[in-house]
Structures are given as C-alpha cells and as structure tokens.
Regions:
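Long, intrinsically disordered, low-complexity segments
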Residues: 1, 97-107, 143, 147, ...
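Flexible, polar/acidic helix-loop-strand segments at domain edges
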Residues: 7-110
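Short loop/turn segments at secondary-structure transitions that flank enzyme active sites
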Residues: 34-40, 152, 176, 194
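Structural register within alpha-helical repeat arrays
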Residues: 110, 117-119, 124
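Short, flexible helix-adjacent loops and helix caps
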Residues: 123-127, 155
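Intrinsically disordered, low-complexity Ser/Thr- and acidic-rich flexible linkers and loops
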Residues: 127-134
Length: 261
C-alpha cells in the first residue's frame, strides 16, 4: 500500500508506475529488498566481473542479475524482513550472530492481537465502528493503532464505513503487518477465500530500469511496469480442512477422514 494508507489499486492512492517504490507504506522498506537497493557495502573483495555487474545493488529489473529463478528472485523482490542487509559473504555481518543467523519469532505479537480484536468486533458487534463489551477501542481504532506505530495514515473513511470495505482493508493489513510470519494460509482459510481469485495466484513485477538513483533508490525510474502470473495454486474445498492421520482414522470406524481427504 501507500503511506497515505490506501491500497495501490485505489485511484486516490496515485500509485506511480514510473516510480513504483516512492512513498510506499514504511513497512515495505522494512520487509522487502527492491530494485536498486544497495545490499552489499564492502566491495573490496569484488572480482572485475562483479564490479562490472555492480552486484552491490539489487538488480531486480527484468533480466537483471538478481532475477535468476533458480536461486534468486522470481518475483522482482527479495525478503528483507528478519535478514539484515550485512548478512552476506562480502560484509560478513553474519559473524555477529555466531555461526548462523538465528531468527526469533514471537508466538503472538501485540499487532496480531489488535487485528484479531478488530476482525472479531467488526463481525460480531455490528460493524467497524463497534466496540466489544468492556473495551475502549472500535475495530477501526484497533487497526489505526497499528498504522500509527508504522507511520501510515488511518483507515480511510470510505473503507471504515461498511463491513465489506473494512474487511478488505483488514485483510490487507494482516498481509502487510504480519508478512512472512506464517499467518496467511490459515487467514485465507478462515475467510473462505483460499480458493478464490486473486488469492489463488502469485505474480511477479516486471519492469525495465530507466534510471537508478543510487543515493535514494525509492526515487529510481522504471518503464513497462507490469504484473505477470507465475504460479496458480490449485486449492479446492478440501483445503479448508486438514487431513487426519490415517492411523487415527483407522482406530474407530466411526472416526471419519475429513472431507476430500
């Protein structure tokens, strides 16, 4: 999304396809390595070929040397969340973490609690402006708490005024705030959207680099910015369930396997 709190596809967001990394939600920059970002600081060990290819920058444009689908990026982006930029073979920042980079992830974050509260209240207490008994926050307030911390504008009134509009923003908020923390599959199952378009596809960002701003890559200019489908997931109704162990099902004739399995 955009820093102003709107999704990219909202006309009022004014998403600029020539400068697609400008004025985005600050969490994008914290979570994602995008084209032109300097990911290697120490270039002293570079070979002549590495210097020529300028591999210290994430060359994620279409055809760039960070777009090898076998071991780099299929999507035009790389993961930055949980991974300090200096953790690479040239900067050797991983040495500060011992023999290997260890990631500590909480079982439950406060942001997740706010989002669960917002979803439950909006659906169970009459809408986005409702509060749960004994609580001071509305569903919208709870989401805005998270956005305030992240430096993003509040949920726009056109989304906060209806349950459908609010849920579209809440689903997006969970995707952004809890990105790469293992929630999305079960979120989509809970919302019964696992088998629905566009949640069944994965896309790549394809573009040509026109001008790289090495000082501030958010200002870099591109052309032919577009999305292409690279994966279509063949989920079906059975994936709203999980299979029971065959050994458990075989214990009692009355214990049936879950539908579709």
């Amino acid at each position: 999304g955009i820093k102003n709190g709107l999704p990219l596809n909202d006309p009022d967001a004014h998403f600029d396809k020539e400068h697609p990394w400008r004025d985005l939600d600050p969490r994008f920059y914290a979570d994602i390595t995008y084209d032109g970002l300097q990911v290697i600081q120490n270039t002293a060990k570079f070979t002549s070929e590495q210097k020529d290819k300028q591999i210290q920058y994430a060359n994620l444009y279409t055809g760039g040397n960070y777009r090898d689908v076998k071991n780099e990026s299929r999507t035009g982006y790389l993961l930055h969340k949980f991974t300090p930029l200096v953790v690479n073979g040239f900067d050797e920042g991983f040495r500060d973490y011992g023999d290997a980079l260890t990631i500590q992830v909480s079982w439950m974050r406060l942001s997740d609690i706010y989002l669960m509260y917002a979803e439950a209240v909006a659906n169970g207490y009459g809408g986005p402006s409702a509060k749960a008994d004994g609580c001071s926050l509305t569903a919208v307030d709870a989401v805005n708490k998270i956005r305030e911390r992240a430096g993003v504008d509040d949920v726009a009134s056109k989304y906060a005024g209806s349950l459908d509009g609010f849920m579209s923003e809440l689903r997006r908020e969970r995707a952004v705030e809890l990105a790469y923390e293992g929630h999305r599959f079960n979120d989509l199952r809970r919302w019964l959207l696992l088998t629905e378009y566009p949640y069944t596809i994965k896309t790549s960002q394809e573009f040509d680099r026109v001008e790289l701003d090495k000082e501030d890559p958010t200002q870099s200019r591109v052309s032919n910015f577009r999305e292409e489908v690279i994966v279509t997931r063949n989920f079906s109704e059975k994936h709203y369930w999980l299979p029971l162990k065959v050994s458990d099902v075989n214990i009692y004739p009355e214990l049936y396997q879950n539908p579709g399995w």
